[in-house]
From Swiss-Prot:
It comes from the Bacteria. Monomer. AMP binds at T31, R36, N57, L58, V59, G85, F86, P87, R88, Q92, R156, R167. GO terms for cellular component: cytoplasm. This is Adenylate kinase. Its main location: cytoplasm. Residues 30-59 are annotated as: NMP.
Length: 220
């Protein structure tokens, strides 16, 4: 089974991706990881990607698609895979279609923007150890202080409310249209003979509750 997991930053995709991968015994396919591996290995595609990146440019969808096709030929992808961070745009989704890479199921983890802002902007971290807290969901024993050392906690720059709002804005502009694209495909309104299933999962509740909703949808 080939799966795409969609959702805004902070919706919990990373946590749920790990659960899905382990539960279904399929690998996570990360385009970023594949690019880095290809560059490190010095493959023809890796060298081509390195040349582009060294010039300060974004790697084209064509190169990414070629790397994905190579990855899907590996033995661990025989029973399927979970796409991590891809596609991000309609153009990339259409590239998958043109290359004949059929997707079986698209899962959207839906969380309201306000909830995501609260989740992410409430994070606090102890820089030295990496211990993380949340002012609402997992507060330290003493506000603003690490439980073990008593040292101050900090808010990472990418967790500020302003930054989170900007990331959500980019998501709604660039990635959210994929939700309409795949929901239309699932309803038979798109082009192409193969139509993936599409399921919207509410991303509120415990991690385990969300996991069970996703697995039930995938096995249904």
């Amino acid at each position: 089974m080939r799966i795409i997991l969609l959702g805004a930053p902070g919706a919990g995709k990373g946590t749920q991706s790990n659960y899905i991968s382990k539960s279904l015994a399929i690998p996570q396919i990360s385009t970023g990881d594949m690019l880095r591996a290809a560059v490190k290995a010095g493959t023809p595609l890796g060298l081509k990607a390195k040349e582009v990146m060294d010039g300060g440019n974004l790697v084209s969808d064509d190169i990414i698609m070629d790397i994905i096709k190579e990855r899907l030929l590996e033995h661990d992808c025989k029973e399927g895979c979970l796409f991590d961070g891809f596609p991000r745009t309609i153009a990339q989704a259409e590239s998958l279609d043109r290359q004949g890479i059929d997707i079986d199921h698209v899962i959207e983890i839906h969380v309201d923007d306000r909830e995501i802002i609260d989740r992410m902007s409430g994070r606090r971290v102890h820089p030295a150890s990496g211990r993380t807290y949340h002012i609402r969901f997992n507060p330290p024993q003493t506000a603003g202080m690490d439980d073990e050392t008593g040292e101050p906690l900090v808010q990472r720059a990418d967790d500020t409310e302003e930054t989170v709002k900007k990331r959500l804005e980019i998501y709604h502009d660039q990635t959210a249209p994929l939700i309409e694209y795949y929901s239309r495909r699932a309803a038979g309104a798109g082009t192409g003979a193969f139509a993936p299933r599409y399921t919207r999962i509410e991303g509120t509740g415990s991690v385990e509750e969300i996991r069970d909703r996703i697995l039930e949808a995938l096995r249904g």
